[in-house]
């Protein structure tokens, strides 16, 4: 599958573009126009542009004729995803690899497998980089607001962990041995006493709302041990230092380390920063 963004000035050539792409990449089955994200779940707005059927390329196929559910590989794991119903971005692999590096270092500090929480997990790509490492992860909390994402997440977890994960009819958050998974508003996680003070690592992949959710989720962390919070944050170029201080002030330990690493410009006045918080 290939996603393309088509600028208006070249739209008149889209048929030629699609055929050229598919002829150059014979393994590509489907080409979709990516018209950005939409809705509360930030699902991609996709339009079919080209479909390979029995070796022949059909341009502008009907939506009913295409299957957008695919399997992708990351860190040696196969991830079931469907960009038409659940957010997934392969461009975040660098962040996910860094998560794994931080997790390995944290395990050494703690001296045992770590408990990982991903309250905006989607189909689970961040977890894919962690669960295949020997003795790295013990317990998992994986939640999201999108029921379709949770359905695919549970499929992925069953394969990765080799265990049964039961699903309620509404896919609500529930525990299956060492895995909590399901539909849950991250704002309400701290209302569950079972989840409080339990987690050693948390992933907050919500760039526009990282600072909003951080204080709501800190109570889930096990403050008796070192812990790490990883995520991304969009902020103004001239407010990075201020944001750094604000994040530091929210930590329970004054010796915590906050790293804000600007990765790229998000707009002319804002940066997309990688965030690492280490609580000693």
Q: In which residue ranges do the predicted regions lie?
A:
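SAM-dependent transferase fold signal centered on methyltransferase-like domains
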Residues: 1-280
